[in-house]
């Protein structure tokens, strides 16, 4: 039987093994979309435990735990200990077999911490303690882990109203061998006109852009101004969470009317939203 998580894990033939070991493995990581928190990278955050690193904000793991019947307090609760949360994740992991979460968990244990044991309730305490001990070492800081994986560049997910201060300060002070961290333009909130919080968001945009927004054209001008600000601070790409492309016909006057309704907090019709 083939060993799980060996050096040729998911590399099922010689061509795949050659391409990975002799080519891809030597290349740097350039990540166009990540969920890293800019403040943690900028401050070279030191993780207090494997729970903070793994479960501090991973909604994929939380979803699996909820599906496994784990109480919400062990996912996002503030009154449970790091060990209690990790223990519940360890209870869930065996049930994620054949899900990428199972692969990721054990690949990370092996490649970051040198741990080849399978995570389960029986091994949870041992793995928890070993990971936490290693996290005290400088090379396990946020940037240290990025360097370990040969990360050359990450693009974070940033809203047009973000001030990008972490990116700006990081760019000023980063060492030559530190990975690049640049913002990516994620304007979903400006597009979601049907959202109840849309008007409040437009007011935030108005404040940070310095553009008084009374009509749709003003919002476009404000977004252009923020887009220029992002570009001036290294942004090279947009990152959109679009589930469906709309192709309804519209006129400029209709768009202005729809925008005014949304700003008054009035409910839009399906057609108006799609326009």
Q: What is the meaning of each model-derived region?
A:
Residues 2-275:
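Metal-cofactor-binding active-site regions of metalloenzymes
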């Amino acid at each position: 039987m083939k060993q799980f998580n060996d050096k040729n894990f998911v590399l099922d033939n010689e061509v795949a093994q050659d391409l990975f070991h002799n080519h891809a493995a030597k290349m740097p990581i350039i990540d166009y979309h990540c969920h890293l928190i800019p403040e943690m990278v900028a401050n070279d955050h030191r993780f207090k435990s494997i729970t903070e690193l793994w479960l501090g904000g991973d909604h994929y793991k939380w979803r699996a735990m909820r599906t496994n019947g784990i109480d919400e307090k062990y996912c996002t609760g503030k009154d449970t200990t790091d060990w209690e949360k990790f223990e519940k994740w360890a209870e869930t992991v065996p049930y994620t077999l054949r899900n990428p979460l199972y692969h990721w968990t054990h690949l990370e244990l092996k490649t970051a911490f040198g741990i080849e044991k399978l995570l389960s309730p029986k091994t949870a305490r041992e793995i928890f303690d070993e990971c936490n001990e290693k996290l005290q070492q400088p090379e396990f800081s946020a940037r240290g882990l990025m360097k370990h994986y040969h990360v050359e560049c990450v693009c974070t997910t940033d809203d047009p109203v973000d001030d990008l201060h972490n990116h700006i300060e990081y760019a000023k002070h980063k060492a030559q061998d530190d990975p690049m961290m640049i913002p990516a333009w994620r304007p979903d909130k400006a597009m979601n006109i049907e959202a109840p919080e849309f008007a409040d968001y437009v007011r935030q945009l108005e404040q940070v852009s310095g553009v008084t927004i009374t009509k749709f054209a003003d919002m476009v001008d404000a977004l252009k101004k923020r887009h220029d600000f992002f570009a001036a601070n290294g942004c090279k790409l947009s990152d959109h969470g679009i589930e469906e492309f709309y192709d309804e016909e519209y006129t400029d006057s209709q768009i202005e009317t729809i925008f005014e309704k949304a700003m008054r907090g009035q409910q839009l019709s399906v057609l108006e939203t799609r326009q």
